[in-house]
Each structure stands twice: as structure tokens, then as C-alpha cells.
Amino acid sequence: MQDHLVNETKNIVEVGIDSSIEESYLAYSMSVIIGRALPDARDGLKPVHRRILYAMHELGLTSKVAYKKSARIVGDVIGKYHPHGDTAVYDALVRMAQDFSMRLELVDGQGNFGSIDGDNAAAMRYTEARMTKASEEILRDIDKDTIDFVPNYDDTLKEPDILPSRLPNLLVNGANGIAVGMATSIPPHRIDEIIDALAHVLGNPNAELDKILEFVKGPDFPTGGIIYGKAGIVEAYKTGRGRVKVRAKVHVEKTKNKEIIVLGEMPFQTNKAKLVEQISDLAREKQIEGISEVRDESDREGIRVVIELKRDAMSEIVLNHLYKLTTMETTFSIILLAIYNKEPKIFTLLELLRLFLNHRKTIIIRRTIFELEKAKARAHILEGYLIALDNIDEIVRLIKTSPSPEAAKNALIERFSLSEIQSKAILEMRLQRLTGLERDKIKEEYQNLLELIDDLNGILKSEDRLNEVVKTELLEVKEQFSSPRRTEIQESYESIDTEDLIANEPMVVSMSYKGYVKRVDLKAYERQNRGGKGKLSGSTYEDDFIENFFVANTHDILLFITNKGQLYHLKVYKIPEASRIAMGKAIVNLISLAPNEKIMATLSTKDFSDERSLAFFTKNGVVKRTNLSEFGGNRSYSGIRAIVLDEGDELVGAKVVDKNAKHLLIASYLGMFIKFPLEDVREIGRTTRGVMGIRLNENDFVVGAVVISDDSNKLLSVSENGLGKQTLAEAYREQSRGGKGVIGMKLTQKTGNLVSVISVDDENLNLMILTASAKMIRVSIKDIRETGRNASGVKLINTADKVVYVNSCPKEEEPENLETSSVQNLFE
């Protein structure tokens, strides 16, 4: 027993695990690349597709015979040629039968073969299939020694290594596949254009791509649609890689009082049902405004998805949002990767055209040799027949006097110098061939064979003659399968600028404590006299109230800065417009806020100019300034870091600082104000902390800040019980940054603590005051008395509610005077 174990141990070879894994993975990779995922550059088929078509050919399932069960076909494929799962084989067969997947179907399916809505095909035991005329052309001449056959997986049968493919299947139907470390994505094309290009290359071997582009306009998807921009097409055809934008084809129908958008053609590989659901969700969530209903009216006549618009909706704006937010516009990546000589390679369009032509030449040469040998063999026999017919009496005598067939055969060979094949054919010839009519047929057949042999020899000897045959067969295929172009191609990509379609009007943007945001036309709010009761500005959920509002133009950029120091930006028009009493939309649907992250400041700006900066203020008195240009870019949804906060601190506000600014003023909850030079806070990067702006007493914290450009600037302070006053900036003496400040407003039990301080240089502005119960009142600022810094102010609103925010806004009569500088910032 021990000796046996020793002998077994001697047969063990130790190898490094890294080298073993490397070799095994390489073998697996090549197996996937060559044997599964990528098509051959010549016939455009992956192994599974080639085996399916060959199995159908062996079953005799031509386009003119009765259908056979798909299960029978799949069984033959996996049993004889493709030792993989039946589901994978059936899925491949199903795809070849789908008119929305293939530009030229290779399988004629009967039964449920799936739909563009993503519905699965029926089980293979229910469906039936046969070949189409297109797949017959791919297999044509396979029995004429045109291709090589290789052993199948168990070496019991032979299968084709490649198919003759009389039609350029790779470019006509395209291909998609993901291998190991590489992928292919070849779009389908119109067969007429591809064959015209092939004919041109055949006659002009040195043809340039520019000339080919006169024939091949671009991809032609089975689902139609519109390709925008030719640059991506040219790049793909030139280098083998490119990208094109594909849009659904739509038209707008007008009814009595509204419009409907009708979608008639889909981008390639788009699931219609999911698209309809996607549009419905976006409309329901108000991410796309103006849609009242979406319904699918598609039937056997074709696709028809109806998007019904609201009465006041503009179809151009809705379409622009649909293209940006849904799969009504997709990007198709073109990768012309295929297998040639057992190796994967990225080809240019010209290389693929030349490869197919070379393949067809090889097929035709092999077929010609096969037919030539067959014709020569037949002519040889006919020559024997003619000798026999000329000497029929003597031949009959020789046969009659011969003791055996073998002796008769030898006698004929010796007497008339015949070959063994000829003498055998004469002995097997029927007596009816001796009639005069049959003699003439033999002579005619022989003469025709001589002409055929001469013609076949001409093909083999002349390159021009060979090219002529290739071209003739290509034109026959074109005539048989010609079809109109389905995909429209626009010269350039045009995206409608939504801003150009939206009027630049002042809006009141409000946000609730729980983060519901909306915008309302400024005209919806009426001006009232000082001391008025106010008007309800919006309904809220229970335990929620409007805590933040501001005025901005629809084209302005809103900067949202959160308590965690994160900054987000969004165009005003992207905030859903609502009625004055509506609750609005959750801000988390517009920007990506983290848990417990709350917006503390919202600013309005026209652009991200480097001539301005942002000043940030924290609850514990830290101030920081960063150039505005550092916050531009496309990270509007995920946000960008604006300030680094100390532990336990949080951001309470921010300000836009322009070149005219001279001082910063910070105000605290207990009424302390500090004014210091702007130069004391130099500009620093985004991911920094800042410096101390005000030193706070116990239980005190920052509630607001103002940027001062001149000592004549007026500041308006408002307490939580609704008292307010105007004070000149010069009333607050300049101090060094980091001090405790001076009393800015006399606070008593009647006034309550300080809520906010804002700049109000324009007396023609109105003051908007917001209470915790969502009441809002507009008061003319010129009606608010100017007092000293140590005064308490006058009553601005008669209500038992606590004031939570205040802001200035343009008067309703002069909305055109709205400027970025008039839009103030709000702080808690």
C-alpha cells in the first residue's frame, strides 16, 4: 500500500498557482472570444448562430417547407454542435427571428417570439421556425466544397468553420457581444448601401473612405429613429470606434386646445414598455412639467405612443426634457470588432468591405473548381457515350460475346481506348439512350459542357472575370432584399436650449422646513400695507412650515449650501412651478442630499464669474471666502464641498461677494453685530476651514450676515416677534475680525431675539415676512422707519406667530428691475 502511494506521488507535478491561474484564464478568455462572444468578420455570425443555421439546413428547413418545432431545432444544435444550455441556443434563435432586432431576419418564426416591450418568447415547445430566404443565401453553395468543415465537439460529426454567406451579414445585421476584456457593437445597415459600396470597392481597390460615405450613409436600425450628427459615424468608419446619438422619431398633433406628442419610431434596443413607464414616472414626479397623460396605442400597424400635454405646455420644452431624461434619446457606441484568422481585431469600414469581398472571391474560386471538376467528369462520360453511339453495332457485339461484365468492360477499353469510367458508364447506359432524340440530347449536353468548362476556366484565369461574377451575385442579392432606409440621418446634433424657450421672469422660490420646494410667479402675491394680516403663501404637511423664500429670475442659477458645507447648483426653471397654495416638491428629488443634511442658504447668480466670490458663515462664527469660479461644472446633483467644518459646527449662511464689496457684517441671535474689512478674509480654496469672524458669548450663535459696499448701505433687522428697523451701515463701527462686536438691535421680551439682518438699499423694494404657520406679507420698505443701531424698531406684522425669515423683493409693478444683487440670502 505504501509503495502504491509513493508511485502515485511521483506523477504529481508542482506548478505555481499564479502561472496556473494565468494559463487557465487565458485559455478561458480565448474560448469566450473565439468560440462564443464575437462574430467572424466574413459571415458575420457567432458560433451559436452558425450552428443554428447549419442545423436547420441539415433538417431541410428551407423557406418553402413547413415549420418545425423550435425545440427540435434546439435539440439538434445542442446535441450535435453546441454543447451548452438550451436556453442560450433558443434565445439566439429567437433574436434571429425578431424584426426589431435584425435588419434582415435569418429565422422565420411562427408563434410568440417576444416583443419590443421586452416580453419573452413563448417556450420552445410552442413556437416553430424555419429558414428565411436571407439565411438560405448565407448557406448557399455550402455543398460545393466552398468552405472547410471541422470536427464537432465530440469528433463524431463535421460542422462548417465558416459559411459561404452570399450577403454581407456582418454589416447588414450588425452584432453585439461582450467577451473577456473586449466587446463588439456593430450597427445594422441598409443592404442596398452596403452592396453599392462593395461594388465600388470591387472596381476601385484603392477606394477612399470619403467615396464610400457617398454610398454608406450610416447605420440603419430596424426600429428606425433619427441619428443626429455624422461626425461619430465618420469616426467609427475611419477608426473602428465611434458614438452616435439616436432619437425617437416623433411628430406633434394639435387638437382643439392642446398638443399631443406622438412617438412613432424607437431608438435601437430600447424597451418601449419601460420607456412609457419612465415617461409616466417623470411626469408624475413633476421632473417633466406639462404632461397630463401617457398611453401606448401601438398595434399591428406599428408603434404609436401618445404623450398628451397640458393646455399651457410647450411641446418643444417637453420634448427637450424627454430627450434628456429618457431613452427617447440614446447613445449608440460603435465598435467594429470581429474575428479574423482566429484573432480579434478592430476593423475600419473599408477593411470589413475588403474582407467580405476576399471571402466571396475565395468561395467563388472554390465553387468554380468544384463545378469545373464536376463538368469535366461529366464531359468525360459523355465523350464515351458519343464513341459508343458512333460504334453501337460493334459495341453490342462485344458485349454479347463477352463472358462477363468485367470482360466486356476490358474489351471496350482495349478496342476503343476508353477509360474505365467511360466503359462502365456505357455498360450501365439504358437502351432508350440509343434513340435518335437521346443521341441529339447527349451531343447538346456535351457541347454545353464544353462551353461551361471554358467559362469556368476563364473565371479561374482572369481576375476581371472573377470580379464580374462577385459583382453580379451581389447585385442579385441587392435586388432580392432591397428595402427603403428606415433610420433618418441628420447632418449635425442639435439640442434645443431649454432656456431659449423659457421666459426670463421673476419667481418666488420657497422651501419648507422639511425640504419641499416650489416656484411661484411673483405676480401671485399682492402688496399690503404695514400691519396687514398677510396671505397664505403655501400649504404644508403637519409639523412643517415654510422657512425659506427668495426671489430670482427663471434663468438664474440657484446655489444651495447645506449645513454640512456642501454646495449644489440648479437653474430656477428646473424647480417645478406650482400654485401659491401648493406644497411643492421634495428637494431631495432635485439634488442628492445626505441624511440629516439641510439647506441653510440659497443664493442666486447669473454665472460662475471669477470676478466674484462666495462668503460662508458658520454657526460658531467662522467666516470663509472662496472664488465663485471654483463651484462651476456639472456636479449639480451630487454637489461639491464648499467648506470644511469644525466638529460640532455647521454652516448657517452664505453670500455672493462682488468687486464693490468693502465690509462683511455678521449678526448673532442675541443681537450682537460685527463689521470688519473684507480684506481681513482673503480668498482660499474650497476644501479649507476659514477664519474666526465673530467671538460669541455663551448660548449665542450666528443668524445672518450682510456684504457692505458703502457706509450709506441700509441694513434691515427683524426680530422673531415681528419688529423691524432700518439702520445705516455707518452706525456700526469697523472692528477687527474676530471681536465680540457691538449691540446691533435692542432686544427685549417684546421684540424677542434677532431673526435676520438683510441689506435694503433700494426703498422701492418690498419686504416679505414669513411666519412659522406659513403666512407671508409684503410690506413696502420705505414704510419702515430708519433708527439707530440700539433701537428696537416698529411692528411689521400683527400675528402671534414667530417670524422665521425675511427677505426683500421687487415690487409687483416693476418685475423687470430684478437684479442678482437684489436677491438676498436667508439664515436660520
UniProtKB/Swiss-Prot annotation:
Enzymatic reactions: ATP-dependent breakage, passage and rejoining of double-stranded DNA
GO cellular component terms attached to this protein's record: chromosome; cytoplasm; DNA topoisomerase type II (double strand cut, ATP-hydrolyzing) complex
Pfam families: DNA_gyraseA_C, DNA_topoisoIV
Enzyme class: isomerase
EC number: 5.6.2.2
Signal peptide start-end: none
Keyword annotations of the record: ATP-binding, Cytoplasm, DNA-binding, Isomerase, Nucleotide-binding, Topoisomerase
Active site, renumbered: 126
Protein name, as recorded: DNA gyrase subunit A
Organism, as annotated: Helicobacter pylori (strain J99 / ATCC 700824) (Campylobacter pylori J99)
Lineage of source species: Bacteria, Pseudomonadati, Campylobacterota, Epsilonproteobacteria, Campylobacterales
